[in-house]
Amino acid sequence: MKQPTLIRPRLRHRRSTPAAATKMCPKRHWLVNNRAAGSRGSGGAAARSRRSLDQIVEVLVALIVVNCLATAAAALITPPDSLESLGSLGIPSSSASSSEDDDDMSSGFYRIPHRLEGYPQLQQLQRGQNFKISPKPCSFGRVEGTCMFVWECIKSEGKHVGMCVDSFMFGSCCTHNYTDNIVLPQTAFSYTRPTKPLTLRPRPPAAPYKPMISGMTTIERPHGAGTLVIRPSGPHHQGTLARPHPPPYQSKPTTASDLHGSASHPSSSSSSSSSSNPNSIWHTSTQQQQQQQHQQNQQNHWQMTTEPSFITKPRPTGWTKPGIVNLPMPARPSKPSKPTKKPIVYDRTPPPPPSVPPSTSTSTTSTSLIWPAQTHPPQPHRPTRPQLSPGTSLAASSSSHWPSSTTSTTSSTTSTTTTTTTTRRTTTPTTTTRRTTTNKPTRPYQRPTTATSSSSTSTTSSKTPTTTRPISSSSSSSSGIVTSSQRPTQPTHRTPVLATSGIETNEISDSSIPDAGALGHVKTISAARSECGVPTLARPETRIVGGKSAAFGRWPWQVSVRRTSFFGFSSTHRCGGALINENWIATAGHCVDDLLISQIRIRVGEYDFSHVQEQLPYIERGVAKKVVHPKYSFLTYEYDLALVKLEQPLEFAPHVSPICLPETDSLLIGMNATVTGWGRLSEGGTLPSVLQEVSVPIVSNDNCKSMFMRAGRQEFIPDIFLCAGYETGGQDSCQGDSGGPLQAKSQDGRFFLAGIISWGIGCAEANLPGVCTRISKFTPWILEHVR
C-alpha cells in the first residue's frame, strides 16, 4: 500500500502526460503522439472505429424515430372527419359543435342591439363551413343577372356580364338565356302582364297578382331624370304596380253618353283647373292640349311587373308637383300617394234619406268644372274615382246633379263639383232628381285610399242634407250645387250615406280602432323652423305589411350614422338615425357611445349604397358634438338615446327634410308604425343596399311582457320602452337598423318620431317584438338641447 503511494508521486512528477508534454513542448507534440500510438497498438484503432459506427447508427435510428413520431402527431392533430366538418379551420368536430351551441345560446339569451358589429365573429366563422354565394339579383346597365361563382355560371351555360360581391367573396353576375330574363333595350315596356281595361270587367279583381320570386329583392332605383325603374320584388314582397298619370279634364264632353256615363269623366284635357277656396291646400295646374279620341283614356290601364321586367314611367311635361301652402287649418292632408295595391270595391246601398226643406245647403268647393250638357234624360251613371289629396283616407264623391225641375228634360248648365275637405265631419247637400246607383268605377287613373262615397238621388226635387260618416282618419267629402242666395246652415240630425263604395286596405284606420279618444289625438311639434313630417317626393298611400324596398325620397328624414375607416377617407354604415332639424339628428345611445366625434359621419338623403348616380345626391357631414342621455345603460339599454350635432347646417331639399316630434304623451297602442333602415334582411343574413321599410303594430307594454313570457323570456319593459311587432313574427328590425326611426302618421297627416330602434332578441321571431326608445318621454330633453 505504501509502495504505490510512494511511486505515484514520483511518476507524476517525473513522467508527464502527453497533454502536459504538449503544453510544455509544442514542437515535440508529434513525438508524444507517436509514442501513445505505439503503446496502444492496433487495439485502440479498432475501438475507435467501433465507436464511430455506433454513433452513426444511433443518429440514423434517431432520425427514423423522429420522422415516425412527427407523422403520427400530424395524423392525430388533423383527423379526416375534422377536415370535412370544419374545412380549413383545423378545429375538432366535437369542440366546434360545443362552441357553436354555446354561441347560439349566448346570442339568443341576451339583449342584442340592432346595430352592426353586434354578434361575435367566431360564430360566423364556424358557420361559414361551406362558402357559398347567395343567389341574389345583380344588374349591369339594363341586364339582370344572378350572383354566383364563375364555375357555376359556366356549368349552367350562363353569360358573365360583370362582377358581384357577397360579403367577402367576389363572384360573377351571370345571366341566362331564359325568356323571363330577356329585356329588350329598345322597348320601354318589356314583358309585362297587362290587365284588361276596367271598362270590360264586371268588377276589379279581389287582390293584385303577387309574383313569388325566390331570392329577389325589390329595388326601385332612379335611372335618369324623370324616369323611375321598378325592379322585381322579393320573396316576401307583393307585385309592384305602376299607374299612368290621369290626363287633365276637358272643358266639353264629346258625346252625351260621356256626360251621363260618368259625371266627371271627360275624354281629354284642354282646360286649366286650380283651387279657388282660400282654405284649400293643393294647387294643380295642367297644360292645354288638343282634344283626342275618347277611347285613348280607356286604353290606359294598370300594368304589373313580372320577373325581371321593368316598368318605366316617364313624367309628363305638363305635370307639376303639388305645392304646400301653410294655412291654419284643423287638419291637413299629406302628399298624393302612389298606389301599390288595388282596392277591393264593394257596394252598400242603405235606405234613401228623408227629405228636408231646401233651405239647408252646405258645401265646400275646391275644383269646379262647368260645361253645357246635351238633351238626354238622366240615366244611371257610373261615378268615377276622384283624385284624392294624399294622406286623406276619405275620397271625394262625384255625382252629376241637374237643377230641380218637374220633368226630366234638358238643362242649360250642369255643374259637377268634386270636393276634398280636411274636416272629420262635413255636411253634404245633394240636389236630387232621380235615384241612381253606384256602380264600379270606370277610370283606372284615380284611386281613393280607403273609401269613396257617392250620393245617390231620388225622384224628389228637394235638397237633402246628409252627414257623411268619418270613415278614415282625415276627411269626408261633399258634392253639390251651392246657391249664393242661401246661407249654409248646420243640420241637427244625421242620416246615413246613401251609397258607399268602400275599399279594403291593410292599413289600420280610425274606424277599426275601438275608441279614438282612448288613443288620444297625437299632437306634433317641430324642432326645425320649417315644416316637418311631410315627404315631398314620394306619395305614400297605404302601408305595406311585409318588408320591401322603399321609394326614393319617401322617408327624407332617414339618415345613416357611419363610422370612418381607412384613416377617414371612407365610412361604413353602422346605425340609422332621424333628422329633427337642420343641425341635429337623433339616434340610439349605443350607436355613438363608444365612438369619438372624429369617427362619426352622418349621411343624409341616402337611398342606395351601391349607386352614386341617383335622382338627388346624398350629403355627408362630420360631427361637431354628441350628447348621449346621462342615464343610458349599456347593460339594459334603458335611456338608449343620443343626439348628434352636425358640423355645418343642412339645406333642406325634396329628399332631405326633418321629422316631427310627438308633443303629447300618447301610448299609441294599436297604431301602425313603419320601421326603416339598411339593416340585415334576416338574422345573420345579407345587408341590403337599398333602404328598406316594414310596417309593424305598436303593442302595449303589458302585452309586450306577456309576449316575452310566452317565448320563455322574462323582460323588464318600463314606460320609456315602446314595443312594436307581430305575435307571429315575420316583420321586425334587425342588425343595422339601430338608431333608425319608428315613424307613425298623426291625424293631421304628418309623420312623427314615435321611437328610436334600440334592441331585440333575434330578428322577426314569434313573440319577440322589437323594442324602441319611446320618444314622447324625451321630447322636452330633445328640445332643450336642439333649440
From Swiss-Prot:
Organism: Drosophila melanogaster
Annotated glycan sites: 177, 672
Highest rank taxon of the organism: Eukaryota
Record region (Disordered): 1-22, 225-516
Listed GO MF terms: serine-type endopeptidase activity
Active site: 590 (charge relay system), 640 (charge relay system), 738 (charge relay system)
Gene responsible for this protein: Sb
Function: Hormone dependent protease required for epithelial morphogenesis, including the formation of bristles, legs, and wings. Has a dual function, detaches imaginal disk cells from extracellular matrices through its extracellular proteolytic domain and transmits an outside-to-inside signal to its intracellular domain to modify the cytoskeleton during morphogenesis.
Descriptive protein name: Serine proteinase stubble
EC category name: hydrolase
PROSITE patterns: TRYPSIN_DOM, TRYPSIN_SER
Coiled-coil zones: none
